[in-house]
Amino acid sequence: LAAGLVSCGLKAKNSNSGEKDTTEAISSETDKKLEKLESLINQYYLKDVDQDELQQGIYEGYIAGLNDPYSVYYDEEATKSFQESTDGEYDGIGAVMSQNKETGIITISQVYEGSPAEQAGMKDNDILYKVEDEEVTGKDLTEVVSKIKGEKGTDVNLTVLRGDDREEVAVTATRDTIEYPTVSSKMLDNGIGYLRITEFDSVTYDQYKNAYNDLKNQGMKGMVVDLRSNPGGSLSIVCKILDEILPEGKIVYTQDKNGKEEDFTSDEEHQIDIPMTVLVNQYSASASEIFAGAIQDYDLGAIVGTQTYGKGVVQQIFDLKDGTCVKLTIAKYFTAKGQDIDGKGITPDVAIDYQADENNPEADNQLNKAIETLQGEMQ
């Protein structure tokens, strides 16, 4: 246990006054206390002890001691899931599942178009009843999803309940590599293209390019980019997309603990030639704010919606070489014009709160305002 902690220790500089190395002192005291705690647990603790769980708890607690919500230790299972989410793809059946906390019922909330799940006959709102003849209601959702995922080309047998009469339907899906759909698009009236980005993952750039080119081929003359509730993602991917939009210049820059700055820039090869607006809300964070901030700094379109989240820091993943990893905050970022948005967010040019319409669930007053604003620029 102690060795794992020491290997993750934060190094402190020795002072010129000959004082004891702070890191060594902290590590030594930590070793002693851990040994004492281990002795007390072995001697007095009533219940059985899972040593793996205990060890993981130490690592998690060590990073939690930084009091930084963005710095996190991931165990092996969490590391694998995190890697899948950042890669934007996984081997599975292509269905999004949610679980009712009270009943334990697992529902198929979305079946991806063209996925193995769709080909097997699964539908949105099906209830997942069995996986390989084992009932899953009330089981941990993460464990259930892990059983459904598997090697590409292998089959998984599922039973779903469908409709009000809960008809039992057996399906067999052949697992394949599934790409998370992070970009969706459609043409609206009057030559306005709508493009929604839910996250900036490894697959997002190609999905953006395909969606943008498809809208242009349909005659798009103005574009609404919807980043509402987009939590962020990859710094390099959002910069790659912005390189397709901005003129030559700085996109964003970062500054580490030593004051070292790194610029991320766009070249002169690409630049958007149509007006645009960007939709944001209080859940638009990190890479979403980099996108909105760049559009705002270059005056390429109005930012519409509410104040964004205010996550102006950058994290890096460090592989711990044992199947686990740690994510640490390593720098702050600033927009091209030097805006520090950490804890503040991006202030929209056109402020408007979302208002639900009970008579028309499909109504979207924020989108309507973005379209209205864009039409003013298109005239």
Predicted regions: what is each one?
Residues Q315-D319, V326-D357:
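Conserved P-loop NTPase
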Residues L1-Q99, K130-V131, V136, L141-M187, ...:
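Intrinsically disordered, Ser/Thr/Pro/Gly-rich linkers and terminal tails that flank
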